[in-house]
């Protein structure tokens, strides 16, 4: 690992700062938001890097221990003892933020990074705190899980109007700006981590709750696309987790947060999550984000957009979770065509 100028060399101390017990992922899940446990580590990081300390505050929980300290954000990664060593995510985030900043995208500034050798080896990253409101604060998304599942049990709604579409220029303008922001990011890039979005079996486990016939069809479709369309040399850099907490809006400025899931992938990987997880297939957003499919009133173009979103969600690490948690889709899906028809009905 190449040391940043702001990175502290690893050093062992006799005094143990962390009083928590980490033995598996469940134990990490119970403690990773505990300010009392992580405060001594944060104080030590501040001492090492001569950073001002103030009382830590909670931020939106994710996978790692993340706290606000004044105008800084401290991220302490789950150690190997948690069962899933997240420290590699730190290298991914640093690379991704540096690349994004060079592309003119507003992202947090890396202030310090390093490893604390305590009771456990804790990789950490200190970033600046970006101003603005999270996307979820401006546009709270509706819960579709109570209204959608019946739509795919047999017949699919005939038109997007049936789910309550109404024009919203502000939504459309924002989505258009986000697409422009992503343009210099979603470009070819050198390999910067070992994530395989297509073949990694661990990334397919979120599809386990789905019916067997759907899972088999999903794998068949992916295999066919790998033979014809998806070649590694055509993959681009993607943020990988464009959700309602990872986008901040401050006037006309859009900031992107949390690049831990950045990777190389087909462009559909990025676009599909934006369409489903971020925009929840809200047509007002989709019109701004995908103008090339909406600017001309052609059903064929919307068919192509439905295909694109379907392909992307089938390979996304969070694809299965998004369909279940945001749209209530799981047991009623028996083919990828049913999923594609559902998506098409919302366009």
Task: Tell where the protein language model's regions lie, with residue ranges.
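Juxta-kinase regulatory segment immediately upstream of eukaryotic protein kinase catalytic domains
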Residues: 2-53
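An alpha-helical support segment within catalytic cores of ATP-dependent transferases
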Residues: 33-49, 115-118, 148, 156, ...
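Short glycine/proline-enriched coil/turn segments at helix->beta-strand junctions
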Residues: 51-52, 69-72, 103-106, 250-253, ...
């Amino acid at each position: 690992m190449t040391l940043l100028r702001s990175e502290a060399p690893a050093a062992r101390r006799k005094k143990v700062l962390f009083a928590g017990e980490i033995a598996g992922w469940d134990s990490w899940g119970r403690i990773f938001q505990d300010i009392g446990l992580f405060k001594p580590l944060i104080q030590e990081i501040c001492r090492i890097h001569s950073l001002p300390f103030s009382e830590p505050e909670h931020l939106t929980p994710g996978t790692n221990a993340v706290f606000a300290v004044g105008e800084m954000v401290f991220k302490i990664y789950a150690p190997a003892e948690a069962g899933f060593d997240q420290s590699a995510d730190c290298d991914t985030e640093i690379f991704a933020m540096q690349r994004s900043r060079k592309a003119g995208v507003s992202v947090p500034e890396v202030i310090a990074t390093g490893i604390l050798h305590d009771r456990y080896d804790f990789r950490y990253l200190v970033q600046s705190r970006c101003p603005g409101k999270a996307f979820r604060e401006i546009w709270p998304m509706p819960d579709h899980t109570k209204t959608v599942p019946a739509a795919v049990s047999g017949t699919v709604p005939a038109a997007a109007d049936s789910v309550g579409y109404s024009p919203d220029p502000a939504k459309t303008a924002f989505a258009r700006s986000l697409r422009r922001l992503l343009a210099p990011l979603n470009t070819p890039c050198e390999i910067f981590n070992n994530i395989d979005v297509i073949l990694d079996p661990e990334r397919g486990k979120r599809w386990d709750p789905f019916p067997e016939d759907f899972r088999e069809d999903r794998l068949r479709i992916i295999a066919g696309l790998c033979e014809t369309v998806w070649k590694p040399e055509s993959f681009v850099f993607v943020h990988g987790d464009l959700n309602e907490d990872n986008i901040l809006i401050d006037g006309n400025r859009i900031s992107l947060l949390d690049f831990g899931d950045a990777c190389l992938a087909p462009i559909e990987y990025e676009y599909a999550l934006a369409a489903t997880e971020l925009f929840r297939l809200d047509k007002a957003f989709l019109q701004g984000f995908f103008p090339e499919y909406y600017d001309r009133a052609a059903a064929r173009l919307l068919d192509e957009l439905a295909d694109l979103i379907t392909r992307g969600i089938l390979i996304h690490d969070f694809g299965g979770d998004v369909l279940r948690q945001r749209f209530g889709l799981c047991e009623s899906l028996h083919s990828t065509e049913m999923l594609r028809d559902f998506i098409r009905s919302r366009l």
